Amino acid sequence: MTKNARQFPGGPFAAASCAIIGLTACGGGTVSDPPLTGTQHLAFAYFQQCVNPIFQKQLQITLNGVTTTNTCAAGGCHDNTSGTGGAFRIIGAAQPVDLANPANTPDLIRALDMYKNFISAQGETVIGSPAQSLLVRKPLLQNVLHGGGLVFASNLDPNVKLIEYWIGNPVPQGQDEFSTTTYSTMFTPAFNPSSPNSSTCNSF
């Protein structure tokens, strides 16, 4: 299995410094995401509908014993312009892609901000293995440092369940991230691009 999770830039000493300094020291500098490798992908539709909204939510975050409210996409966290959260960057203003519009071809979608969020998040995963994925482990502080502190108290958090489901249910081999196969397997009832809010996101 290809491991897509990125390592903490700067090695263990930089990671330790990040934890000590806190939320504004999760990383920094210009980030250039490496190209995706491997033949299996995660589902774009599920990401857009079920996972990306988590990054915009106001969440309770505990850092150095102090609990505050913030979003993952906030400046000082994982915002793509002012965030210091390492390679994982989120464009907070990314607009949903109309997957029912035939003009939105895969090539066009891959140039949009929502897709950039998708690739950035997928880069923090080990496809098919939520337990090994930094996108799950870091906000839970599961044997890994996270400059943003504890975001989710346990794996029972509904947000974690959605992220785990996304990672644990990759698109079938040989199909790309826009495969409509996932519309019926990852949503109830089946995802309808013309009425995206009519379906519920499946989760573990």
Task: Identify the residue ranges that each predicted region occupies.
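Bacterial N-terminal signal peptides that target proteins for export
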Residues: 2-16
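Residue-level "hotspot" positions that anchor or transmit function at local structural transition points
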Residues: 14, 43, 126-127
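Bacterial N-terminal signal peptides
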Residues: 14-24
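Bacterial Sec-dependent N-terminal signal peptides
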Residues: 22-46, 183, 187-195, 201-204
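Composition-driven recognition of low-complexity segments enriched
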Residues: 27-29, 68, 82
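Electrostatic cytochrome c docking/interface patches
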Residues: 34-66
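Electron-transfer interface patches adjacent to heme c in soluble/periplasmic c-type cytochromes
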Residues: 70-75, 79-80, 84-204
